[in-house]
Amino acid sequence: MAARWSSENVVVEFRDSQATAMSVDCLGQHAVLSGRRFLYIVNLDAPFEGHRKISRQSKWDIGAVQWNPHDSFAHYFAASSNQRVDLYKWKDGSGEVGTTLQGHTRVISDLDWAVFEPDLLVTSSVDTYIYIWDIKDTRKPTVALSAVAGASQVKWNKKNANCLATSHDGDVRIWDKRKPSTAVEYLAAHLSKIHGLDWHPDSEHILATSSQDNSVKFWDYRQPRKYLNILPCQVPVWKARYTPFSNGLVTVMVPQLRRENSLLLWNVFDLNTPVHTFVGHDDVVLEFQWRKQKEGSKDYQLVTWSRDQTLRMWRVDSQMQRLCANDILDGVDEFIESISLLPEPEKTLHTEDTDHQHTASHGEEEALKEDPPRNLLEERKSDQLGLPQTLQQEFSLINVQIRNVNVEMDAADRSCTVSVHCSNHRVKMLVKFPAQYPNNAAPSFQFINPTTITSTMKAKLLKILKDTALQKVKRGQSCLEPCLRQLVSCLESFVNQEDSASSNPFALPNSVTPPLPTFARVTTAYGSYQDANIPFPRTSGARFCGAGYLVYFTRPMTMHRAVSPTEPTPRSLSALSAYHTGLIAPMKIRTEAPGNLRLYSGSPTRSEKEQVSISSFYYKERKSRRWKSKREGSDSGNRQIKAAGKVIIQDIACLLPVHKSLGELYILNVNDIQETCQKNAASALLVGRKDLVQVWSLATVATDLCLGPKSDPDLETPWARHPFGRQLLESLLAHYCRLRDVQTLAMLCSVFEAQSRPQGLPNPFGPFPNRSSNLVVSHSRYPSFTSSGSCSSMSDPGLNTGGWNIAGREAEHLSSPWGESSPEELRFGSLTYSDPRERERDQHDKNKRLLDPANTQQFDDFKKCYGEILYRWGLREKRAEVLKFVSCPPDPHKGIEFGVYCSHCRSEVRGTQCAICKGFTFQCAICHVAVRGSSNFCLTCGHGGHTSHMMEWFRTQEVCPTGCGCHCLLESTF
């Protein structure tokens, strides 16, 4: 907690108000407290002299209330109740409802008056709509914004009349009211619900969000993927709002927790400890707002409303305001802000008055943010594992190319010389790295000849470079690349200021555009060390998908290579940083010293007007000849050339061994296997697969009923042991395995699976008894097929038939009589069968099957893979028919279950009655009657009984009713 704290200056109690919302008018004269029955208007200049009431008839509480922020409309305020908004007018000591806004279909969550237009009011609701109303015409909203999720907060930008922000669970959307169809920018701000949202009072791009995830984050919506800073808290944050002075922030914790009733004042430049704590409320703070500063006074007043039904006004004097100020080297800070990030046109909302003030001649530079608190450093170490840890690594990893910069690096001497040429100015600087660098040890910067800039500019550059280096090394990060960027950016900004001053000597400095707020930032270069391990983007690629299509993309035909074919491809995405902005161009590195390291400089230089893309790193637009047309001024060479190639989807079904038409024509009739094989042969003939016609013809003969095996193993050798039996079928399966024809494999396995089943016998877990599943050999003689559904699973060269050995299989069977079993089967059989005749019958059941039961698992994989292909084809009924023949039982349950032992025979019981002794499983420890209904038991001693008896016993007792001495309430929960 902060060392400084204070109690309130003014306390006013409203015991009967039951107000849930509060607002202070823009003049600082009145506050409105919104209850269910009355609205209380409090005179803040004389809060003890009574208050006025406005009666309201509603069963709904007021969710949000706000005065109009414009002086000419200061007597209007809006209050939301359920699905409507009432507009009140307070004048001459009396108030009345002026009009009502109705349009939402769900509860209104928030409202906000426009900062620049007094007639506009925005409302948000959980019905996913955000409405902008004009109070001059309240029949319907003038603008409707729609989102997927409901909005909990809505706030107008304090510097841009067209910009507003809304929060949706943990996300923030930035809107332009002129483009209501879609949001301008999206921020994935928090992992939990956002409770508070507030724009910076001096910058149109910066906002703060407070969330249920115990944090307040600061954002520049031009950089939606990276927050500027974070304020970690111990509990969820209800509201976080900027102060009207300096760089302060006030936070309040979530009301539902009832832990912290104080308000905390923070300096956004130092978020480690609050600079002030407002202590006094006995219950959670529901709302707080700032009162307008009185004329001639430097003090501010903070007005708060709490659930303890007290209104308190806190005085914030100039001394407290200075705690939030950052007055160190104001001139340098103003200079830093003058070279701040220039907005991207597609992400920045400009007003008509300021459009001409923004230029993009120098691209953009990443915005700076403040160092995070120390307790976050440990959490971010994992993000820095890819960063260089030594100077040698830093020199070798730098892959950034900056225009007009020469760098000579000497890792042995731990130094480098940087030369920058900008306009008529030249800067040469010596950078020396201490031995502890980059572990909280910053390098030193020294200007050397020839350097042509002024002493004032040298001081400013040194200040900026030292600050940038310190911010990096505090977190153990390398700083050479960020310092190079800052050096060039500052120097070019200084030169531009000189040029603009000389071209317009009558222009007033900063007469139109105020400087951006002094908000701390840290340079995070795009495509820098963080991307050193990310492969360089592709300009072409191809991918197979499971439905028989090939998706690929290539470079446009209008482009050709910009570099020679021998030029090495960049190794990582960090090389693309040279093309991210117009400010950056190839860096030329001198390598006079033999031991120096040379940076990558093989990319082509591009002009300022060329568009930046991944393709432009490899290719450049072909120079097209221009022909004059008959029409004057037309030029065929000026036509637009596409900067990206097309994405093409190609049907490659003709190259695959599976056919969708066969999938539609194939049948599986388990009642007539002969008819199934004959019709499938006819279907194969229709699509021109003569090889499959022969296969299905052989299958028709092999499934003839006259070849059916006898039940007695002593009568004859089963047909499956014949060379044209199982051996022929296995050779067919091996052949189509080599062809990756999973369609034929699955259909053959399904047909012969159905042929081996006894008529009328259901098969939930396989064609053989469950106990024989222990005898299935784990290895497979077929290639591995998975049910991924991708064509790559059938065309992967890694799928081979090396495990399929017909000769070895035959030798194995010829070495012993057909009725004998292998030693492995005998070993398992001796454990499973007590009667040798039973084992012999079971072995006969396996030998008479055309499909080897040892490969059942692989046959199931064929069917699952083919079923996945049928699903992608949209043949779901065919898929269901095939999957009916999957014979493997479901995986056994591996979770935790509570079992019961019978109190009589000590057998495991799954119900209330024992299946062995037929007695009831357990008795109540109190009434000694069998328990059949609701029961509770101690997990330590195992005693228990009827729930009602146990509850009544433990109302007055602490030990087990059986007298075992167990303290059941402490050991387990009843």
From Swiss-Prot:
InterPro entries given in the database record: RWD_dom (IPR006575), UBQ-conjugating_enzyme/RWD (IPR016135), WD40/YVTN_repeat-like_dom_sf (IPR015943), WD40_repeat_CS (IPR019775), WD40_repeat_dom_sf (IPR036322), WD40_rpt (IPR001680), WDR59-like (IPR049567), WDR59_mRING-H2-C3H3C2 (IPR039456)
WD repeat placement: 57-98, 103-143, 146-185, 189-229, 232-276, 278-318, 319-362, 668-706
Keyword Repeat part of the UniProt annotation: yes
Binding site for Zn(2+) 1: 902, 905, 914, 917
Positions bound to Zn(2+) 4: 943, 960, 964
One cellular component (GO) term of this entry: GATOR2 complex
C4-type zinc finger segments: 901-920
Reported regulation of activity: The GATOR2 complex is negatively regulated by the upstream amino acid sensors CASTOR1 and SESN2, which sequester the GATOR2 complex in absence of amino acids. In the presence of abundant amino acids, GATOR2 is released from CASTOR1 and SESN2 and activated.
GO terms of biological process kind: cellular response to amino acid starvation; cellular response to nutrient levels; negative regulation of TORC1 signaling; positive regulation of TORC1 signaling
UniProt keyword terms in alphabetical order: Lysosome, Membrane, Metal-binding, Phosphoprotein, Repeat, WD repeat, Zinc, Zinc-finger
GO MF annotations in UniProt: signaling adaptor activity; zinc ion binding
Positions contributing to Zn(2+) 3 binding: 938, 966, 968
Classification via PANTHER family: GATOR COMPLEX PROTEIN WDR59
Subunit and interaction comment: Component of the GATOR2 subcomplex, composed of MIOS, SEC13, SEH1L, WDR24 and WDR59. The GATOR2 complex interacts with CASTOR1 and CASTOR2; the interaction is negatively regulated by arginine. The GATOR2 complex interacts with SESN1, SESN2 and SESN3; the interaction is negatively regulated by amino acids. Interacts with DDB1-CUL4A/B E3 ligase complexes.
The name this protein goes by in its record: GATOR2 complex protein WDR59
Gene source species: Homo sapiens
GN (gene name): WDR59
